[in-house]
């Protein structure tokens, strides 16, 4: 949203206590008047009136009332159960009850609260009951009758108690819906008057007071409003201006304990809780919520600078990782679970919202006894905690693509200040379920393609490994073939050398002192000697017909035979090794 002062909303001063308020304070019982005055005095000490933005100012004041009366410790489900225990669910909405019965209701609420808390955390029930009752009377009993309507009590307590805003709105709709499940416009007008009485009670009537204009800002008189449309209107961005403080009140409760380990550049506090604001123009310039709301600055920073609101803290490393992750995403996420930034008035329902009317409501038992049942029944429209994505403050735009929205907002606030009642209702409130289905289908297809690519990569990697093994086996085979060829050549050389020696033995002259042929012919021979052929036969014949000295020739022949034997043994070993390698590859599946 674009605001005229660049850094926040129009400065709308809170109203001081009016004369009517003082007359009402004097007309109520003294005890109630004193307790109400005590609340007002303590609220003034918090200096909420110095907050520049009316929305934040109203939310801060009501948050103070919540914490002071301890009603923020009671959730919506226990509050509804207290209504049932005291029989308020069986009474018509405009039934008037006495102050004593309202006090009995508050007694039930806070006594049940102490039963759920440990002893060290018990609240002072008397103080809480008296303060809350005084606030209710100050807000709704303007005529000093000492009575309150059932509807005003339900609206006030359901608004101020703890719990999710969507659950509270469902309960409120159950109170203002007809038997067909559609909103009754007369009851809605009454509801709006009751809830805006809370902001009027904390002196924010100039901005958030009830008027016919406020009713027209929400719905047209002839519009059929179902539960989904009702929720979508109050949880949309932006919601109707008269009720903008309501979602902010719940977001304040959710970030009240969020810790930011950074230094505020205005007040120099080393760390703080709540919201954190970062300037989009000044380098690493950050402010705590108190300084930003009240316009405190330092250095060259100006309130005209654009600011972003953060509800949690991320270290620079996490921010970098998150930015890289978002840049690599093919499809934008529809919801962010852990994001740290929020739109100041953004509340989204966790699922597509249908514009069809909800089924008729049973007003006698509209709210289930347990939260689990109602969450199951409304799973399509239940909302999670407030989103935490970084966005601009109301009136700020970080991108040039929303200029049209900025002009619309300027026109809206100009019309509001000039007193016109026209409020352009937002169109396209429900999400397109077909688009969601298409996105899911596309995601499934991409996941399937990714799985196929992973399987194909694994197959190619396995094939590459197999090819490498086959190439190594081929190289080994070539090496063995080369060795076999070399050994065969060596064998041929040795055989030629042996034949040459045999030829010398057969053709050489006989020594003078040698053995006679007759003596050699008389040497005994075995059967194996007679079977010698080839070289062995030549050797045998050489010994029988000795022509050279026997000792020399025998040594040469034995040496040649040893070399042939060694060469053949090496050849056999190499062949056996090659055969074992081939068998191993076959076993491994190559």
Curated annotation (Swiss-Prot):
A zinc finger (ZZ-type) spans 259-315. GO terms for cellular component: cytoplasm; dystrobrevin complex; dystrophin-associated glycoprotein complex; plasma membrane; synapse. Residues 1-25 are annotated as: Disordered. GO terms for molecular function: acetylcholine transmembrane transporter activity; cytoskeletal protein binding; zinc ion binding. Residues 434-508 form a coiled coil. It is found in: Cytoplasm. The keyword Coiled coil applies. The keyword RNA-binding does not apply. GO terms for biological process: acetylcholine transport; establishment of synaptic specificity at neuromuscular junction; locomotory behavior; muscle cell cellular homeostasis; positive regulation of locomotion; positive regulation of synaptic transmission, cholinergic; sarcomere organization; synaptic signaling. Residues 468-590 are annotated as: Essential for interaction with ctn-1. Residues 484-490 are annotated as: Essential for interaction with dys-1. From late embryogenesis to adulthood, expressed in neurons and muscles; particularly strong in the ventral nerve cord and in muscles of the body wall, head pharyngeal, and vulva; weaker in the intestinal muscle (at protein level). Its main location: cytoplasm. Plays a role in cholinergic transmission and as a functional partner of dystrophin (dys-1), necessary for muscle maintenance. Required for localization of ctn-1 near dense bodies in muscle cells. The coiled-coil domain mediates the specific interaction with dys-1 and ctn-1. This is Dystrobrevin-1. The lineage of its organism: Eukaryota, Metazoa, Ecdysozoa, Nematoda, Chromadorea. The gene is dyb-1.
